[in-house]
Amino acid sequence: MALWGGRFSQAADQRFKQFNDSLRFDYRLAEQDIVGSIGWSKALVTVNVLSEQEQQQLEQALNALLVDVQADPEMILQSDAEDIHSWVEQRLIEKVGDLGKKLHTGRSRNDQVATDLKLWCKTQIAELLLSVRQLRQALVTTAEANQDAVMPGYTHLQRAQPVTFAHWCLAYHEMLARDESRLEDTLKRLDVSPLGCGALAGTAYPIDREQLAGWLGFASATRNSLDTVSDRDHVLELLSDASIGMIHLSRFAEDLIFFNSGEAAFVELSDRVTSGSSLMPQKKNPDALELIRGKCGRVQGALTGMMMTLKGLPLAYNKDMQEDKEGLFDALDTWHDCLMMAGLVLEGIQVKRPRCKEAAEQGYANSTELADYLVAKGVPFREAHHIVGEAVVEAIRQGKALEALPLADLQKFSAVIAEDVYPILALQSCLDKRAAQGGVSPQQVAKAISDAKQRLA
C-alpha cells in the first residue's frame, strides 16, 4: 500500500520501488510511529476531526498493533509496504476499516518521521546513558581493586613516569563521564516535538502543539515548521556523541592490547573475551578489544556520511534525508555493543603486579624526581634538566638504574647531590609526590575513587 498515487497513471517500476522503499530499516520505528499516531488521534479530537468514540476505537486498535509489534517486530518485514508509516496505516485500516483513513488528516510523513526518529533517539539515549554508567562503574570497581598496582605511564609510547593501574582506569572513567554529559546535552536539544508541522508550512488545523508535545513526552514543541522538517541536527549530534565515545573505547582497547602483549605483559585477559589461532596453538588473541578498536571506524564513517548528505540540501524535506537512519541505527548499536564488551573485558582482567612494578622501575621514569631534587637544592630547572640528562646517559652506559649509581658518580654531574637523593628516587616516592588534585599519589587516587562513587550514586 502506498500513501500516494492519484497523481500517477503508471505503477512504479519494481526496481525503483526496491530502491525507494525504506521499510527494511525504518521498521525499527514501529513503536514510535504507533505512539505518535495515538497522540495525533487525540489532537484530532480537539479540532473535531474525530469524535471521542472514534479516537478510542483508533487508540484501541493502535495499542493492539503495538502489542503485536513488541512481540515480533520483524514480522513487519514480510510486508511490501513502502515504509513504516504505510505499514502502520495499512494494518490500522485492516483493523478498523475506513476510520483508519481519517488518522492522517492534517499530518505529513515529513513531521511524522521526524517525530518517530526523535522518539526513538530519546529511547536510545536512555539506554546508552545506562550502558555508559555501567562501564564507568566497572572502571571504578577495577580501580579500587588495583590501587597498589604500580606501572609505567607513557608519552610517545615511551616510559615516562610511574602511575598506577587504578589511575589509568580513572582516566577512562573521566572520558566516559564526558560521554554521558554529551548525551544529556543532546537530549535537551532534541526534546522538542515536530508533530503538527505538516509537510513544511505547518498543519492547517488549530492543533495545540504544546499540549500534543506533552502527550508524546516531549518537553515542548518546535518553533518553526520549515526548520522542523528539515532538521537532523539531533542525528548529527548523536553520531558525534557516538564517534567521540567510540574513540575513547578504541583508545581503551589499544592500551589494553599493548598491556596484554608479550612485550608488556602487564595484564592477562580472560578466556571469555579472547580467541585462539587455527594454526598456532599457543596464541590467545585479544579479539574483543581488537573489534572494539576496529568498529570505531564504522561509527566515524556514519557521522561523516551524514554530514555530507546534509551539507547541500535546500529547505525543506528531501528524499536524501531517508539516509539518516541506517547509519544512525548501526552507529548506536555498535556503540552500545562496544560499551557492553568493554565492561566484560574488565570483569575478568588480571593485573600482573610484579611485572608492572618491574617495568615501572625501568626506563629511568624517576628522572623528573632527580631534576626536582636539584631544583630544591637551588639549581635552576633548565640546568637541572640538562644535568639529569647527562646522568641518564651515564646510567645507560653502566647498565644501571639511576638509583643504582654510586653517589660519587652522581656527584660528577652536580656537587649538590647527597645521600638524601636515594629515597627521592624510590618508586613509591615518585608516586607520593604527585599529591595535587588529579595526581597519582595513593591519597589522591583514593580520593578520586571516592569522588567517582559519589558521582555515580
From Swiss-Prot:
Q: Which residues form a coiled coil?
A: none
Query: GO annotations under biological process?
Result: arginine biosynthetic process via ornithine; L-arginine biosynthetic process
Q: Where in the cell is it found?
A: Cytoplasm
Query: Which Pfam families does its entry note?
Result: ASL_C2, Lyase_1
Cite the annotated pathway. Answer: Amino-acid biosynthesis; L-arginine biosynthesis; L-arginine from L-ornithine and carbamoyl phosphate: step 3/3
List the EC numbers from the record. 4.3.2.1
Could you confirm whether the keyword Cytoplasm appears in this record?
yes
Keywords, ordered alphabetically:
Amino-acid biosynthesis, Arginine biosynthesis, Cytoplasm, Lyase
GO MF terms held by the record: argininosuccinate lyase activity
| Record-stated family | Belongs to the lyase 1 family. Argininosuccinate lyase subfamily.
How is this protein named in the record? Argininosuccinate lyase
- Biological source species: Pectobacterium carotovorum subsp. carotovorum (strain PC1)
